[in-house]
From Swiss-Prot:
Catalytic activity: myo-inositol + ATP = 1D-myo-inositol 3-phosphate + ADP + H(+)
Keywords, in A-Z order: ATP-binding, Kinase, Nucleotide-binding, Transferase
Name of the protein described by the UniProt record: Inositol 3-kinase
Phenotype reported upon loss of the gene: Strong reduction in seed phytic acid, and strong increase of inorganic phosphate and myo-inositol levels in seeds.
Sites where the protein binds ATP: 217, 267-270, 294
Claim: ATP-binding is one of the keywords in the record: yes
EC number: 2.7.1.64
Protein family (similarity comment): Belongs to the carbohydrate kinase pfkB family.
Active site: 270 (proton acceptor)
Highest taxon in the source lineage: Eukaryota
UniProt enzyme class: transferase
């Protein structure tokens, strides 16, 4: 699948080609993550059961730090930049994710969400929680982004903070752009309740041909319009315990899940998208990379808030990826096209990651209090 670019933007394409030349075989491909940190308050049965660092950028940076190939073995600085905004009331400045990637401070309060969890199990298209935005920080403007080229970008807004013009600037700066649908289609009523609008009716729709991947939950998929959007970019629909599906112009694929005991679904989709991006950085095809996305999505739901990954589990995952991927001087994140279909090692990769998932389960059993504090989602 070719990466789309405006045909008359010759200068932009020359800069992209220069990025390809300068990073090939170099120290790493720098990424750009755009989306704000939040205060998340988790409520069940009318009482607060958790207060955590939230915002897709926190979950995404957590997985990229853990799973990206660049610098992972050498303990180098993370090869990506996070642009997030918070207010002076931000209380998680010392949390690992936000400490590694400090946000921009502004005068408005930090974005805050209240998540009211249902007493009943969620269905395929019904949410297991009701979200309400109770405070909103300033949006992220194009001028807030670094003025340099990036190999890839992830637009992961949660409260409308990634403006259309900001996404367009990301597309100008980044060779490849991946977008979480929630950054594009969320709408908020007067009480802050989160709803959705059709992607085709938003100012973002015209940018889709220049985006490589859009990730949506099964609840968001009808608003994305999969059949229309797949003709412009690859659409990934996460289906929880059923794994995920990839749709592109002329093909589709189902990717199997990994078992998980769900404690808190917050951040599962964000962790999936970051795992998927990490898979592309390792040189996997899109469908193979979705296995890594499913793996980290499952890891995220087993803890409350931004998860902590056991070092043994991470080491096992890195060894699997090193064994299963070939050394490439130009990973597909920096190439001119993506391979979308499953490779001939897809099933082997899934089986190997299943074994790593056992380590994740053993960690949870050995230390059930690690980041959890009980099952928030069910009685």
């Amino acid at each position: 699948m070719p990466l789309a670019a405006e045909p008359d933007d010759a200068h932009e394409e020359r800069e992209n080609q220069q990025l390809l030349i300068t990073t090939k075989g170099g120290p790493g491909l720098e990424g750009l993550v755009v989306g704000s940190y939040c205060h998340d308050v988790l409520i069940r049965g009318g009482r607060i059961v958790g207060e955590t660092l939230g915002g897709a950028a926190a979950f995404v940076s957590n997985v990229l730090d853990a799973a990206s190939p660049q610098g992972a073995a050498l303990n180098e600085t993370s090869p990506f930049v996070v642009v997030a905004k918070v207010g002076h009331d931000f209380i998680y400045a010392r949390a690992p994710a936000s400490a590694r990637h400090p946000p921009l401070l502004c005068s408005s309060p930090t974005t805050s969400f209240h998540a009211q969890f249902s007493e009943t199990a969620a269905s395929a298209h019904a949410p297991d929680r009701e979200l309400r935005r109770v405070r909103a920080c300033d949006p992220i403007y194009p001028a807030d982004l670094p003025d340099r080229r990036f190999a890839y970008g992830l637009a992961v807004g949660v409260a409308g903070e990634v403006l259309p013009e900001t996404l367009e600037q990301m597309i100008r700066l980044c060779r490849t752009v991946l977008v979480d649908a929630q950054a594009l289609i969320r709408a908020f009523d007067g009480d802050g309740a989160v709803g959705h609008v059709a992607l085709g009716d938003t100012p973002y729709a015209r940018l889709l041909p220049r985006v490589a991947f859009v990730k949506a939950s099964s609840e968001e998929a009808p608003y994305v319009g999969v059949e229309t959007t797949r003709r412009q970019c690859c659409v990934i629909v996460t289906e929880g315990r059923d794994g995920c599906r990839l749709y592109w112009d002329g093909g589709e694929a189902h990717v199997a899940p990994f078992p998980a005991v769900q404690v808190d679904p917050t951040g599962a989709g964000d962790s999936f998208l970051a795992g998927f991006a990490a898979g592309l950085l390792w040189g996997l095809s899109a469908t193979d990379a979705a296995l890594l996305g499913n793996f980290f999505g499952a890891a995220a739901v087993s803890q409350v808030g931004v998860p902590t990954f056991h070092p043994k589990m991470l080491q096992a995952v890195k060894e699997i990826l090193e064994e299963k991927t070939r050394k490439r001087s130009s990973p597909c994140m920096n190439g001119a096209s993506f391979t979308l279909e499953k490779s001939n090692m897809h099933n082997e990769l899934h089986a190997a990651l299943q074994e790593a998932a056992v380590l994740m389960s053993e960690q949870q059993q050995a230390d059930p209090a690690n980041g959890s504090g009980g099952d928030i989602c069910s009685a």
